């Protein structure tokens, strides 16, 4: 849903604002952990804490964008990996009964990769005027996460 879309874009934007190796290592860490979590959570019942974890991930990554926080690359990878567990489990428990797990995971990995890339590209093409827009986007993402958390 919208929560996953915003999270994937946000991770890409944040990684892109850090530049260098962070722009590909941080999204890659997210993708790998999300895929593993998705594979291992298939057939599990949905747990309400998963949706709360996704909402918190939006709040925190949105704040990282707003405040233009640049962490060491490994620390950034760890942060997004924790969030990726929630997103992966959410995808895994939603596996349709008739779907092939391999194709299903491949689909959400491809979609996530494209959304991360869009975020990285948007961040890489920023200028002084788009800095404000980038921070407003981060604020909207964080606010959406907060609203989702309150709704849970």
PLM features: what roles do these ranges have?
Residues 2-152:
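Membrane metalloprotein/metal-transporter helix-bundle signature
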